[in-house]
Every structure is written in C-alpha cells, then in structure tokens.
Amino acid sequence: MIPVVIEQTSRGERSYDIYSRLLKDRIIMLTGPVEDNMANSIIAQLLFLDAQDNTKDIYLYVNTPGGSVSAGLAIVDTMNFIKSDVQTIVMGMAASMGTIIASSGTKGKRFMLPNAEYLIHQPMGGTGSGTQQTDMAIVAEQLLKTRKRLEKILSDNSGKTIKQIHKDAERDYWMDAKETLEYGFIDAIMENNELK
C-alpha cells in the first residue's frame, strides 16, 4: 500500500500518493531491484523534471541491491543526457548496479547516509541448461565486454584505476560510508541533513 499525503491549498484539500508529492519537490526514489519497469519509471521522472526546469537539481535517493545491467545503464545514460544536475543520496545500500547508478550522480553532489553500504563486484550472468557450446562462448564474451564497460564507469566515477577496480570487484567488495568516501564514489556523508 502506498501512503497518501493530504495538503491544504487555497482551493481546498488535495491528496497525493507519497511518490507524486516527493516528485513535486524533484525527489525520485530508486528502491528495490533494478529492472526494466523500475528503470522506465525512473527515466520518465528524470525526463519530466528536466523538461520542467533544467536549472534545478534532481534528488535521486538510492536503496537497491542492484539488478539488470541494461536497465541500470539506461538510467545512467539518462542522468548524463539531461541538463539538470542529479544529486544522488544513498540510504540503505547501493549494491552492484546500484553502485554504478549512485556513483554516476553529478560530481560534488553524490552523498551517502552514515549507515548505508556500497558493494562492487563483477557482473553475473550465465546460460541455462541445454545451451549450445557456441552460445556459451558468446555469453562469456559479452560478460567480459560488460565487465570492462562497468569498470570504466566505476573508474571514471571514483578516480581509481581500471586495474584497481578490476582487482577489487573480483569478489564482493563491501564498503561502509567512510570507506566509500575514501574510495571516491561519493563526495560527502550526510548526517542530520549536514555534510560531513
């Protein structure tokens, strides 16, 4: 169930679902697994807010275990395409594809709450049973290409070398807020609405 907010206006009461009310303040909630429907919703909100006023920041709150690479990269490409600055605020976790999205916010405007976590690792994929050997080779080659592309994005977003990203992402690499700041994925830790 989605909570409803009731506001008093000069024309009487107006009710909004909470996400529509947040959108009015240029806040987008990216929560749950990254998949096509969620990505389409996030992209539509980014485009709408940018068309409304591209001189104001958009606030993207992130709490996701990650998910689809193609859906996540569609969000990242849209963030880079629009003129509005996109502030990212990680709460809970930004894991896997969530790290790519959260670290792709406008440099200087990437934040994290003190108890949130970041996770980087190599992309996952596979083939089902009954897959032909040739198809397995194609999938393996595509996974390697995807890994290189994601490592380049993480390197650009953090300032770390691709070699360092490759080494750290070999297995699950968890970071708390302080470690994420030191790594270069965020620009500050937010505590009580203040930057640390």
From Swiss-Prot:
It comes from the Bacteria. One of its GO terms (molecular function) is ATPase binding. Cleaves peptides in various proteins in a process that requires ATP hydrolysis. Has a chymotrypsin-like activity. Plays a major role in the degradation of misfolded proteins. It comes from Streptococcus uberis (strain ATCC BAA-854 / 0140J). SUPFAM superfamilies: ClpP/crotonase (SSF52096). It is found in: Cytoplasm. It catalyses: Hydrolysis of proteins to small peptides in the presence of ATP and magnesium. alpha-casein is the usual test substrate. In the absence of ATP, only oligopeptides shorter than five residues are hydrolyzed (such as succinyl-Leu-Tyr-|-NHMec, and Leu-Tyr-Leu-|-Tyr-Trp, in which cleavage of the -Tyr-|-Leu- and -Tyr-|-Trp bonds also occurs). This is ATP-dependent Clp protease proteolytic subunit. Its EC number is 3.4.21.92. Belongs to the peptidase S14 family. It holds the Pfam family CLP_protease. PROSITE patterns: CLP_PROTEASE_HIS (PS00382), CLP_PROTEASE_SER (PS00381). Keywords: Cytoplasm, Hydrolase, Protease, Serine protease. The active site is at 96 (nucleophile), 121. One of its GO terms (cellular component) is cytoplasm. NCBIfam families: PRK00277.1 (NF001368), PRK12553.1 (NF009205).
